[in-house]
């Protein structure tokens, strides 16, 4: 006879699927002049935060990176935070 353990059965943890903050009806547009928006996607060290952390879609992540690089080139954002 097989013994039945008395340990409680754990339900699997379901992580809520993140949605892209730039998709949808009233989503903000990615613009290199909008420094406040771009700073939310830059780390404390000045690096661009990856999309797996920010949940930005692949297409919008490329647009975001291009806007950040453009703003850096124009001097609106720093390359390195000192």
Curated annotation (Swiss-Prot):
Gene3D superfamilies: Ribosomal protein S18
InterPro entries the UniProt entry points to: Ribosomal_bS18 (IPR001648), Ribosomal_bS18_CS (IPR018275), Ribosomal_bS18_sf (IPR036870)
Keywords: Ribonucleoprotein, Ribosomal protein, RNA-binding, rRNA-binding
Biological role: Binds as a heterodimer with protein bS6 to the central domain of the 16S rRNA, where it helps stabilize the platform of the 30S subunit.
Native source species: Sinorhizobium fredii (strain NBRC 101917 / NGR234)
Highest taxon of source: Bacteria
The protein's name in its UniProt record: Small ribosomal subunit protein bS18
Lipoprotein in keyword set: no
GO MF annotations in UniProt: small ribosomal subunit rRNA binding; structural constituent of ribosome
Similarity comment: Belongs to the bacterial ribosomal protein bS18 family.
GO biological process, one term: translation
Record Pfam families: Ribosomal_S18
Gene Ontology CC annotation, any one: cytosolic small ribosomal subunit
Known partners and oligomeric status: Part of the 30S ribosomal subunit. Forms a tight heterodimer with protein bS6.
